[in-house]
């Protein structure tokens, strides 16, 4: 059990048979009446967002999520297959369960798979990944006066803005949280 006073961004609770993650919260103490906590909750399974208000000190069931490190081994149709490298047990996730994470997911990558009641809910990517540029416009000499950027499509299909001097085949580091270029990767 968790009190609504203890809500923080990222806290997970069980509500109406589903798992919800606190995206925003605000403790409100009006001049008249009792205090309350106004929250914005995101459903972990579906991604829908709702605003909900709780009484201050209201007790709620905290969702106990388990994280396990699995390796993405291959695709089978529309399913992503992951393997626990210690037990060699396979876990299958649909494209819907993977969500936006699939644009950075490549075979052989290790990720955290979050489960609740032994059901996989979502995939947590590392904060940054190294990917190869598959397609981009060639850089034109002398076109860097303003330090401009150009779109690049990576080997997984993700699109990020990269500096003009980068070309096809180069490996770059990308921040998976906000889809930004972090730098070149050597080696």
From Swiss-Prot:
Database matches in SUPFAM superfamilies: Nucleic acid-binding proteins, Translation proteins SH3-like domain
Compartments, record wording: Cytoplasm
GO cellular component: cytoplasm
GO biological process, one term: peptide biosynthetic process
Family membership noted in the UniProt record: Belongs to the elongation factor P family.
PANTHER family associated with the record: ELONGATION FACTOR P, ELONGATION FACTOR P (EF-P) FAMILY PROTEIN
Lineage, top ranks: Bacteria, Bacillati, Cyanobacteriota, Cyanophyceae, Synechococcales
Name this polypeptide is given: Elongation factor P
One Gene Ontology MF term: translation elongation factor activity
Pfam families: EFP, EFP_N, Elong-fact-P_C
Metabolic or biological pathway: Protein biosynthesis; polypeptide chain elongation
């Amino acid at each position: 059990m968790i009190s609504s006073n203890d809500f923080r961004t990222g806290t997970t609770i069980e509500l109406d048979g589903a798992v919800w993650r606190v995206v925003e919260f605000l403790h409100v103490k009006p001049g008249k009446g009792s205090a309350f906590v106004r929250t914005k909750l995101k459903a972990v399974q579906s991604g829908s967002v709702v605003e909900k208000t709780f009484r201050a000190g209201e007790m709620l069931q905290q969702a106990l999520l388990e994280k396990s490190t699995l390796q993405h081994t291959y695709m089978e149709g529309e399913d992503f297959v992951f393997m626990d490298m210690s037990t060699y047990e396979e876990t299958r996730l649909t494209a819907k369960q993977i969500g936006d994470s699939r644009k950075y997911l490549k075979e052989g990558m290790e990720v955290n798979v979050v489960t609740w009641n032994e059901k996989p809910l979502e995939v947590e990517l590392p904060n940054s990944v190294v990917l190869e540029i598959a397609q981009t416009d060639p850089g034109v000499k002398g076109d860097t006066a303003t330090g401009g950027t150009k779109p690049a499509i990576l080997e997984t299909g993700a699109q990020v803005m990269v500096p003009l001097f980068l070309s096809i085949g180069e490996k770059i580091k990308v921040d998976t949280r906000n889809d930004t270029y972090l730098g070149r990767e050597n080696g």
